[in-house]
């Protein structure tokens, strides 16, 4: 997508893990808010 041939997908320390952590953090906040409310 961005011109990287294998850097974005071949390595786990790229942006994919960062996006995954952000998504999990947002889901955790949503679930926590749902249980609190």
Swiss-Prot record:
Keywords: Membrane, Transmembrane, Transmembrane helix. This is Uncharacterized membrane protein YoyG. The chain crosses the membrane at residues 17-37. It comes from the Bacteria. Pfam families: YjcZ_2. It comes from Bacillus subtilis (strain 168). It is found in: Membrane. It is a single-pass membrane protein. The keyword Thylakoid does not apply. Belongs to the SscA family. GO terms for cellular component: membrane.
């Amino acid at each position: 997508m961005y011109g990287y041939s294998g850097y974005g997908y071949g390595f786990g320390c790229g942006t994919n893990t960062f996006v995954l952590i952000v998504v999990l953090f947002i889901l955790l906040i949503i679930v926590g808010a749902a249980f609190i409310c």
